[in-house]
Amino acid sequence: MIDSDGFRANVGIIICNKFGQVMWARRFGQHSWQFPQGGLDDGESVEEAMYRELYEEVGLRPEHVQILTSTRSWLRYRLPKRLVRQESKPVCIGQKQKWFLLQLKGHDNTINLNSSGHPEFDDWRWVSYWYPVRQVVSFKRDVYRKVMKEFASTTLALQTREFSKKRSKQRS
């Protein structure tokens, strides 16, 4: 779904663990790393697209995650001219994205990069919260910065809650 301004509707997914680290994935056969993302199909809600992409890209189902929050508005980035396919109609000049912050409820082994048979990623790791902002390709950096800033208080609350649990156990 490309809007009248040339932006493709898309969902972005940040998966965090109970320590506030985020899942960082390497694109299949490339050296670039990013968060899972993907376009909306016709007639699909944003949440339906998020769950579909979540399964297609990292093999997780709704029962494996908890939605913590989502962005208040759509965020946009433009593609570099070299990546715009002028021959396709309508021409897509970039992405407009609704982002979700999810917490993995299960174990790391529930992540399966080959769940769809056409993997988007060939490796993944947990990284510190702000790491992706410095590492993502430059044309996505501003969107990543905005998303991470919007979600920061939620992940900080996760980290604080986990730290408090550890201290309580140590005192017992």
Swiss-Prot record:
Q: Which Gene3D superfamilies match?
A: Nucleoside Triphosphate Pyrophosphohydrolase
Where the record annotates domain Nudix hydrolase, the positions are 6-149
The cofactors named for this UniProt entry are: a divalent metal cation
Report any one BP term from Gene Ontology: mRNA catabolic process
What gene is this protein translated from?
rppH
Q: Which Pfam families match?
A: NUDIX
Q: Which CDD domains match?
A: NUDIX_Ap4A_hydrolase_plant_like
Q: Which InterPro entries match?
A: Nudix_hydrolase, NUDIX_hydrolase-like_dom_sf, NUDIX_hydrolase_CS, NUDIX_hydrolase_dom, RppH
EC number assigned by the record: 3.6.1.-
- Motif Nudix box: residue span? 38-59
Q: Which family does it belong to?
A: Belongs to the Nudix hydrolase family. RppH subfamily.
| Entry function | Accelerates the degradation of transcripts by removing pyrophosphate from the 5'-end of triphosphorylated RNA, leading to a more labile monophosphorylated state that can stimulate subsequent ribonuclease cleavage.
Assigned keywords, A-Z: Hydrolase
Please report the organism this UniProt entry assigns to the protein.
Shewanella frigidimarina (strain NCIMB 400)
* UniProt protein name: RNA pyrophosphohydrolase
Annotated Gene Ontology cellular component terms: cytoplasm
Q: What GO molecular functions are on record for this protein?
A: mRNA 5'-diphosphatase activity
